[in-house]
């Protein structure tokens, strides 16, 4: 995820300059995009002591920001956005050296948050800005999905699978209602079109009731349009 974010930063720095925003002005920027989310230190542990670690889950992100150009080099913004988060888990295949076991596949946590990013934007050129701030997020949904199959091996490379079982449901009670993050990002503006990338560095444990210690790690890439007021 960090490599993707750094590549995006590099591409944006290659673009040319546009008109500098005027200080003392307001604007509204609705935006839509995609999220690349993961949960730190999260994993599924099987009965045969194998581990499926979390990996990136791709989802939707969209919302709107209200911006105030404080000076030629500094702008402030507040916004509301909906972001899909959570994580996928790596499939656990059959172990042909074992007499029996369970395979896990298509496992994921699907989380939804309403984010309230509060940001300062520092212009490093006429059209390119770096941003940093704070962000509370409010959990709106949390579901889990796992598919599993028991199996037996014959010791000769053959394997017999039982029926595929699907386990899914609402797990919102596992998670805290509020999460906090530090968003850092970069934005490029061309003819009022805004291209933005943000990395949300989660500060708080998303789980409640001592279920684990995982934090959100989310990259959002979005395109928006700047309406000057």
Regions found by a protein language model. Name each.
Residues 60, 72, 97, 102, ...:
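N-terminal non-globular leader segments, chiefly Sec-dependent signal peptides
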Residues 21-23, 69-71, 125, 191-193, ...:
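Outer-membrane beta-barrel channels and translocator barrels
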Residues 1-31, 223-229:
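Bacterial Sec-dependent N-terminal signal peptides
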Residues 26, 60, 74, 114, ...:
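Hydrophobic core residues within well-ordered beta-strands of beta-rich domains
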Residues 30-34, 60-68, 80-82, 116-124, ...:
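Residues on the lipid-exposed face of transmembrane beta-strands in outer-membrane beta-barrel proteins
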Residues 20-67:
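Short glycine/proline- and aromatic-enriched beta-strand/turn motifs that initiate or cap beta-hairpins
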Residues 38-57, 84-112, 139-179, 183, ...:
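Extracellular/periplasm-exposed beta-strand and loop segments of Gram-negative cell-envelope proteins
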């Amino acid at each position: 995820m960090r490599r993707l974010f750094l590549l995006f930063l590099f591409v944006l720095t290659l673009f040319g300059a546009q008109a500098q925003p005027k200080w003392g002005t307001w604007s509204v920027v609705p935006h839509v995009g995609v999220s690349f989310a993961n949960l730190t230190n999260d994993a599924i542990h099987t009965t045969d002591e194998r581990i499926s670690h979390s990996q990136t889950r791709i989802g939707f992100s969209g919302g709107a920001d209200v911006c105030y150009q404080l000076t030629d080099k500094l702008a402030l913004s507040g916004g509301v956005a909906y972001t899909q988060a959570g994580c996928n888990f790596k499939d656990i295949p059959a172990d042909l050296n074992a007499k029996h076991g369970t395979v896990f596949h298509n496992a994921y946590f699907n989380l939804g948050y309403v984010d309230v990013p509060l940001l300062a934007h520092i212009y490093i050129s006429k059209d390119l800005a770096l941003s940093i701030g704070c962000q509370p997020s409010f959990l709106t949904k949390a579901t889990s999905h796992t598919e599993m199959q028991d199996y037996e091996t014959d010791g000769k490379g053959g394997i017999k699978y039982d029926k595929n079982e699907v386990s899914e449901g609402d797990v919102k009670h596992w998670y805290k209602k509020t999460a906090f993050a530090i968003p850092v990002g970069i934005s490029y503006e061309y003819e009022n079109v805004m291209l933005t990338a943000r990395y949300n560095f989660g500060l708080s444990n998303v789980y409640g009731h001592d279920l684990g210690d995982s934090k959100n790690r989310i990259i959002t890439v979005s395109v928006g349009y700047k309406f000057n007021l």
